[in-house]
């Protein structure tokens, strides 16, 4: 979503997972810190939400991009990967292309005139199948309620000073 929207900066809680501020460095974004007692999710920009630990029915926030995580400690634990939720159909198509080597799925790439840079971020079919197999149990299981103090204050780490 950050690449799609062309963001130049992100606002990151001091307490979150380490990869979020690393993302700013990777993408050349300006990183700003905020003190926030967030629960379940937080906004990185006006419409991009880190919802990596969120697991609640009907929790999508309209007109946003909500990133979910399936990392091994998350409720739907697949070891890696995630999902981006949006209600913007045009954005969904473009972001799918960005995740899939710039191409549309189900059409051989040689038959496409590629117009989008791709980043090879797609989920493997095996991981997706594993997720579908685990989904019924995840739906029936009460999720862990994460609290902001589950993460250290990243601004105190040497890498960010």
Per-range role (PLM):
Residues 1-5, 10, 49, 66-67, ...:
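Generic low-polarity alpha-helical segments
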Residues 2-60:
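PLP-dependent aminotransferase-like
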């Amino acid at each position: 979503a950050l690449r799609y929207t062309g963001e130049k900066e992100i606002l990151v809680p001091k307490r979150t997972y380490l990869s979020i501020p690393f993302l700013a460095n990777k993408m050349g974004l300006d990183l700003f810190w905020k003190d926030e007692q967030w629960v379940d999710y937080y906004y990185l920009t006006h419409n991009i939400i880190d919802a990596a630990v969120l697991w609640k029915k009907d929790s999508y926030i309209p007109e946003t991009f909500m990133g979910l995580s399936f990392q091994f400690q998350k409720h739907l634990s697949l070891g890696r990967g995630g999902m981006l939720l949006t209600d913007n159909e045009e954005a969904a198509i473009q972001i799918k292309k960005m995740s899939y080597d710039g191409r549309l799925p189900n059409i051989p790439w040689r038959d496409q005139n590629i117009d989008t840079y791709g980043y090879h971020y797609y989920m493997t079919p095996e991981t997706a199948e594993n997720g579908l197999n685990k989904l019924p149990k995840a739906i029936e299981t009460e999720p862990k309620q994460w609290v902001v103090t589950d993460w250290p204050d990243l601004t105190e780490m040497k890498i960010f000073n």
